[in-house]
């Protein structure tokens, strides 16, 4: 890994059973950005839906040749992180949303407000099909931005109506499809997607193939669909969400995976590196705080390592992870 003349903070991943402690470098300061890397993953938000602490909700960037070309999710706080990272909306080839929980999409209006002033070409955005009480992504955008009836009618320009906002090119990914679907095909940049189980919430995992390397975002999921490990097979970087501890039980198990399952999915996929993110703490009224990953994050990460033999990176906001 190349040495940079900027501050580096070290995130620790414990290799259980070998006695080895692996230190993996990761920048995590307001000045840190990935613009000097030829290819990198940047964590904008490493938290989940619970407020408190210093973590924004979920969002990630893929940097290529000094530009942020793909953004995955846009949870609360990531509008600020996007600016701190030095990213520019005009550089994005795709903004991909995994599912329609607020901690993954609530900052989308903020990102698009006044976007027409910095970008003229359409912006491709992708999100899941509907199911149950959840609308499809295109209907969701209409409820937000329709010039006549939307929550933010001033952003009607995003839908080709009167108002402001860069025009969106919307891709709806069928979360119930049996096979992966293409989302974007560009020069040395391919994006595909597949549905993953997240209770009754249509949820999408994304695979980005860029310059011969692959980055997979697992989204929120229970880990109950074996097709995911096939979809993520051989990933250079696999991003998995770790909201729960191994002790978790009850209704939360319908939405998220325990650490052992997260590790097993990564092991079955033969991922070269595993990035753990979307850490959660218990809401104030919960009587079982130990069910959530931030109660004892080091121990929760160690539980993942019991079923995954490769290197693990514990995510932090604004962390830059070069992909050689």
Residues covered by each model-derived region:
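Binuclear metal-dependent hydrolase catalytic cores
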Residues: 2, 30-215, 301-323
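Bacterial N-terminal signal peptides that target proteins for export
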Residues: 2-14
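Residue-level recognition of conserved structural "scaffold" positions that shape functional pockets
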Residues: 24-28, 52, 226
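Short N-terminal micro-motifs specific to bacterial/archaeal maturation
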Residues: 8, 51, 99-102, 253, ...
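Cap/insert and terminal regions of metallo-dependent hydrolase folds
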Residues: 205, 214, 221-319
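N-terminal twin-arginine translocation
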Residues: 4-7, 21-29
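Bacterial N-terminal signal peptides
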Residues: 13-23
């Amino acid at each position: 890994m190349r040495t940079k003349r900027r501050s580096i903070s070290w995130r620790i991943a414990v290799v259980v059973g070998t006695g080895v402690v692996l230190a993996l470098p990761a920048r995590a300061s307001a000045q840190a950005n990935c613009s000097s890397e030829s290819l990198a993953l940047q964590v904008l938000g490493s938290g989940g839906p619970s407020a408190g602490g210093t973590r924004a909700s979920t969002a990630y960037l893929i940097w290529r040749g000094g530009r942020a070309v793909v953004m995955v999710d846009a949870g609360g706080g990531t509008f600020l992180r996007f600016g701190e990272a030095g990213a520019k909306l005009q550089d994005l080839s795709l903004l991909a949303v995994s599912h329609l929980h607020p901690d993954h999409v609530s900052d989308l209006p903020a990102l698009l407000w006044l976007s027409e002033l910095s970008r003229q070409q359409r912006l491709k955005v992708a999100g899941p099909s509907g199911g149950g009480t959840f609308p499809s992504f295109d209907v969701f955008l209409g409820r937000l931005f329709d010039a006549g009836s939307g929550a933010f009618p001033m952003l009607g320009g995003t839908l080709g109506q009167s108002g402001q906002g860069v025009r969106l090119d919307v891709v709806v990914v069928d979360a119930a499809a049996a096979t992966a679907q293409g989302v974007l095909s560009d020069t040395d940049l391919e994006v595909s997607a597949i549905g993953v189980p997240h209770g009754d919430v249509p949820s999408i995992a994304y695979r980005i193939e860029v310059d011969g390397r692959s980055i997979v975002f697992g989204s929120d999921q229970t880990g109950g669909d074996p097709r995911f490990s096939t979809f993520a097979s051989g990933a250079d970087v696999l991003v998995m969400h770790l909201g729960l501890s191994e002790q978790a039980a009850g209704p939360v198990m319908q939405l998220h995976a325990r650490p052992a399952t997260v590790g097993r999915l990564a092991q079955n996929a033969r991922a070269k590196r595993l990035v753990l993110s979307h850490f959660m703490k218990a809401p104030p009224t919960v009587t079982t705080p130990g069910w959530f990953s931030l109660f004892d994050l080091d121990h929760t990460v160690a539980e993942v390592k019991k079923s995954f033999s490769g290197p693990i990176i514990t995510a932090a906001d604004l962390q830059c992870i070069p992909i050689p």
